Amino acid sequence: AGYFDTTFVLKEPTYYTISRNTLYLTPGDDMTIKVTQTNTEAEFSGIGAEANNYMKFRLFPKGGSYLEAGGNLRGDFVSTKALVDSLAAIRMHTLDTLSNVSDAFKKLETARIKADIINSYICYASYSRMFAGVKTEEEMRAKWNEFNVSLTQDVTPLYKGDYE
């Protein structure tokens, strides 16, 4: 643990990662930052803080995004999807209410929300018991392909930008 003061010049907004914290820094930002191992406990104040306070709750794709490493898994895909969609709608609403961020930031984060939804749907197969009882590689492959095809109607609008 320690403290430091640094200044650097940015030509354009960009994301940075420090430990599990994702920062969004833009030219002209002037913040006091407390970085922690637990990203949700990080602290930001000053110019640029609003975007970074929002970023504290960024999901982790390797943990299945909205599935939160299986913690948000429900009894079946339909129930899990309903929860994922609800959590994404809340995240989208939170993003929409930010007032001191650029339209470019909102566009990037809207894309991240969509990507997290898609990732959550796809990761359901890995976190659920969908493959329980499957005995052969062929059977598993067939079940996996069937699941992927079933996702098409839910995922396609997200790729096309039709998510509200």
Give the location of each predicted region.
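A non-transmembrane, solvent-exposed segment enriched in polar/low-complexity residues
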Residues: A1-F105
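Extended amphipathic alpha-helical segments with heptad-repeat/coiled-coil character used for oligomerization
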Residues: T110-E164
